[in-house]
């Protein structure tokens, strides 16, 4: 996601997927601090978030300020304190309703001090950004399908292997447990340089931009297999 947004000066973003049959089931990848995502999901703010409620009724992208009701609802909602804390005051949301009855959204946040031309750039590039959301969501569904295939004893990869090699899985597992690269190297009996190499491969395979996001995605999608010691 980060790479796809570099051409727009890397605005803050949230990619969110909600099961429309069971809105409690929500998945979030965001550039915000973990605290924001933890509070949002633990409080089930997707049920009252005016951006989400608007997206449920839309199939086209929308600017938050195109409809004064959205911003006024945001300010009157319980979510406002959280939004204000992280300076989430205005933005642009792209919407996708998929074949599995999910609502997927990519929201780009417009900071108060943002480039004045950013809004017009996003407006003129709506088609490209909408396609980015489609590609991002398709990648997520493929990762999810891979996870389900492994858990069912069936592998969706024609090579007979999971999306991560055993060593990549081991590195990601220990990283998700809070181990540093030197500690992982000691546990796995490899060099720190090799640990970094494997983590780099994990980042590429998961389509994220850094190890922190790879760990979060691996945990969220339950892609990490237990490692026996």
Swiss-Prot record:
Q: Name one GO biological process term.
A: quorum sensing
Q: Which domain of life is it from?
A: Bacteria
| InterPro entries xref list | Sig_transdc_resp-reg_C-effctor, TF_LuxR_autoind-bd_dom, TF_LuxR_autoind-bd_dom_sf, Tscrpt_reg_LuxR_C, WH-like_DNA-bd_sf
Query: What are the record keywords, sorted?
Result: Activator, DNA-binding, Quorum sensing, Transcription, Transcription regulation
Q: Name one Pfam family in it.
A: Autoind_bind
Q: Which residues bind DNA?
A: 181-200
**What's an example of a GO molecular-function annotation for this chain?**
DNA binding
Keyword Transcription regulation attached: yes
Q: Where is the HTH luxR-type domain?
A: 157-222
Family the UniProt entry places it in = Belongs to the autoinducer-regulated transcriptional regulatory protein family.
According to its UniProt entry, the function of this protein is described as: Probable transcriptional activator. Binds to an autoinducer molecule.
PANTHER family of this UniProt entry? DNA-BINDING TRANSCRIPTIONAL ACTIVATOR DEVR_DOSR
**This protein's name:** Transcriptional activator protein YukR
Organism, scientific name: Yersinia ruckeri
Classification from the root reads: Bacteria, Pseudomonadati, Pseudomonadota, Gammaproteobacteria, Enterobacterales
């Amino acid at each position: 996601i980060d790479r796809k947004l570099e051409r727009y000066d890397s605005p803050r973003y949230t990619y969110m997927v909600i099961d429309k049959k069971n809105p409690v089931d929500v998945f979030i990848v965001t550039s915000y601090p973990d605290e924001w995502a933890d509070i949002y999901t633990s409080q089930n703010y997707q049920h009252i978030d005016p951006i989400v409620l608007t997206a449920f009724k839309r199939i086209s992208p929308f600017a938050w300020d195109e409809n004064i009701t959205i911003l006024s609802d945001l300010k009157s909602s319980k979510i406002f304190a959280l939004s204000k804390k992280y300076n989430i005051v205005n933005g642009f949301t792209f919407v996708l309703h998929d074949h599995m009855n999910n609502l997927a959204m990519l929201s780009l946040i417009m900071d108060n001090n943002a480039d004045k031309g950013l809004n017009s750039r996003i407006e003129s590039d709506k088609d490209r950004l909408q396609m980015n959301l489609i590609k991002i969501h398709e990648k997520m569904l493929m990762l999810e399908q891979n996870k389900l295939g492994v858990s069912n004893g069936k592998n969706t990869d024609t090579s007979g292997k999971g999306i991560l090699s055993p060593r990549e899985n081991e590195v990601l597992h220990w990283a998700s447990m809070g181990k540093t690269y030197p500690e992982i190297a000691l546990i796995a009996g490899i060099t720190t340089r090799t640990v970094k190499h494997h983590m780099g491969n994990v980042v590429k395979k998961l389509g994220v931009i850094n190890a922190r996001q790879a760990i979060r995605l691996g945990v969220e999608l339950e892609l990490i297999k237990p490692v026996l010691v």
